Every structure is written in C-alpha cells, then in structure tokens.
C-alpha cells in the first residue's frame, strides 16, 4: 500500500474533456481514509500520455479506450511493452463485452462507459492497494 503522506498521482487520458471530468469527479480528492489524497494529471493526446509516463511519478493510469485518434488500449499495450516499471493501468471500455480487449492490452482492470462512480472507485481502490510488481 502506498505511503499515506504522499499524494497519489493519477493520469487520466481521454480526448473528451467531459470523460476526464467524470473520472476525476467520480474518484474525488480522497478515495479512502487509508490512502493519501489523489492528484490528477489530465492528458488529452496519446503522445502526451507517453511523455508523462516516461517522466515517471504516476501511481495509476486511467486510459479511455474510446479516445481518438489514439485509443487507450493501444497505449496501454505500448506502455506495458516499453516501460520497465509500469504503474497499474485501468482502461475505460466502450461496453462491458470489450473486457477481453483490455486483457489483450495488458491493463490490470477495465471499467465500461458510462463511468459508474461506485464501480470505478472500487476498481481504483483495489489497484492502488495492490502490492507493486
């Protein structure tokens, strides 16, 4: 479990500002009393996701699988293939049946659109509590 004094940095990628806002609003600033505050790095393009992840310091990446022109599943696969120490990735899928695509991308979790705050919160909590690989 992360150090409770250092804020957790969550990268949120979508080309749609409303999707990014829904994700951040669903998670809030404090997901659970046992975890530190959450801070967000909003990203609207695929190249910026890669740049931010290369810089490091991200505790979790939430990638929109429906983003265009670069979808979050392809980015997730690229990050898992290229980063020696990649943080957990959650992919937002277009529908529940797309979970298999998220598995292909090597993302640790998938949550379907539209974002359900309870499902997203539980999923993110489990990823942030999981031991680092």
UniProtKB/Swiss-Prot annotation:
Q: Which GO terms describe its biological process?
A: phosphorelay signal transduction system
> Which InterPro entries does the UniProt record give?
CheY-like_superfamily (IPR011006), Sig_transdc_resp-reg_receiver (IPR001789)
* Boundaries of every Response regulatory domain copy: 9-128
Protein keywords: Phosphoprotein, Two-component regulatory system
- Residue positions where 4-aspartylphosphate is found in the record: 64
A GO cellular component annotated for this chain's UniProt record is: peptidoglycan-based cell wall
In Swiss-Prot or TrEMBL terms, this protein is called Uncharacterized response regulatory protein Rv3143
Q: Which organism is it from?
A: Mycobacterium tuberculosis (strain ATCC 25618 / H37Rv)
């Amino acid at each position: 479990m992360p150090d409770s004094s250092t804020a957790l940095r969550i990268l949120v990628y979508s080309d749609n500002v409303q999707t990014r806002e829904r994700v951040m609003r669903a998670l809030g600033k404090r997901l659970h009393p046992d975890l530190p505050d959450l801070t967000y790095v909003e990203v609207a393009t695929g190249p910026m996701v890669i740049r931010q992840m290369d810089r490091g310091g991200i505790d979790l990446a939430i990638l929109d699988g429906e983003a265009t022109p670069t979808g979050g599943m392809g980015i997730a696969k690229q990050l898992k293939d290229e980063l020696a120490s990649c943080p957990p990735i959650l992919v937002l899928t277009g529908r529940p049946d797309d979970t298999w695509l998220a598995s292909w991308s090597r993302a640790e979790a998938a949550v379907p659109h539209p974002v359900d705050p309870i499902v997203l919160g539980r999923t993110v909590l489990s990823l942030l509590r999981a031991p680092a690989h």
